[in-house]
Amino acid sequence: MDFDYSPKTKDLQDRLQAFMEEHIYPAEGAYHAEIAANTAAGKRWTPLQTIENLKPKAQAAGLWNLFLPVDSAAASGYDGAGLTNQEYAPLAEIMGRVMWSSEVFNCSAPDTGNMETIARYGSESNKARWLKPLLEGKIRSAFAMTEPEVASSDATNIQTRIERQGDDYVINGRKWWTSGAGDPRCAVFITMGKTNPDAPRHSQQSMIIVPAGTAGLTVVRALNVMGYDDAPHGHMEVLFANVRVPAGNILLGEGRGFEIAQGRLGPGRIHHCMRLIGLAERALELMCKRASLRVAFGKPIAAQTVTQERIAEARCKIDMARLLTLKAAWMMDIGGNKFAKNEIAMIKVVAPSMACQVIDWAMQAHGGGGMCDDFPLAYSYVNARTLRFADGPDEVHRNSIAKAELGKYMVKAKPA
């Protein structure tokens, strides 16, 4: 078994790490200062020039749209990096060290998932209208799936209606946690809803493209995540009231929503988990540096046995999560979503919980400082904790893993 990265991946890792050192880490202070200045000026939901100024540099460095896998690149007609999931995974980890950096490389959610969805399932006209400007970074997008009135962890509960009327579809419903909808550059929503309530359970839902600004589409409010609003990106509550779009905006056809979701969410979960591993790596680095410098009870905090135990445990947890995630990425490359289903569920359980624990230990080592925004740890923890819900809660993935495991033995069971 070869655990080494390909020469192509190593080259991109080196170039990406160099870009982070030269441009991203030095810009962290400017990023937060710009948000503070925009907030004071009443312009909190304004695109950040700190990020916009770095995008041309990322493009010039050949570090643009790295997420787009081989099959989606071919479908989109985009001649980019064309990486496999396994090749992209370590790059996502590097970007994850600074939570906003993936946007610099046009590799941030939900745009990545939306671009892959349109590339794979959209018509040629939809690709021309939406995919091209998304790949160029000229517009942003949102993904509307979760609903406030039902337990959306069971996606068959989704109640938003998408009804055919002549040459159009009319959409009615309410969504929340619609990430990306707060950005004024958000030009398009991919929305999941019910087209046929009488169809079999997993054939009732469809996905459809909804241009922002369509009559009846209203962004109701921004939702805070443990006090953070993630402006200017945002997680919004959105109302669809008799929103009418052309029938050609349906993706893949009626009743194919779950099929699309599986194709979309698998790579997205790998991206999220690898970014979390990068976030946890940075938290461990900060923990080690802080513990080595601070003295309590006559010796460095790093000399305390409890601190050493946590550092060792953090290293073990991070490396285990990374290996499992890379395995899931490799399995997806060779066999697709269904082949990697169990491993993807496992990483979605393991990586967020690991990151929460490692970041929590790092916060503890920072004392009171770990709880404030003088350090990135509190915000990092919120991000990691959110991903125990986003793209499916822990409980759903644990149930899936357990069913697969029990299935190995149920066929052999005999009545007593």
Regions picked out by a protein language model, each given a short descriptive name:
Residues 159-161:
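Short, surface-exposed charged micro-motifs
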Residues 1-99, 108, 121-126, 133-138, ...:
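Alpha-helical interface subdomain recognition
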Residues 157, 215-244:
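Flexible, small-/acidic-enriched active-site or ligand-binding loops
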Residues 137-146:
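A short, Trp-centered hydrophobic/proline-enriched beta-strand micro-motif
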Residues 105-125, 154:
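N-terminal glycine-rich flavin-associated loop
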Residues 152, 219, 249-254:
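Cytochrome P450 core scaffold surrounding the K-helix E-X-X-R motif
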Residues 149-153, 180-184, 197-199, 226-234:
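Short Gly/Pro-enriched turn/cap motifs at secondary-structure boundaries
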Residues 167-168, 172-220:
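A short core secondary-structure module
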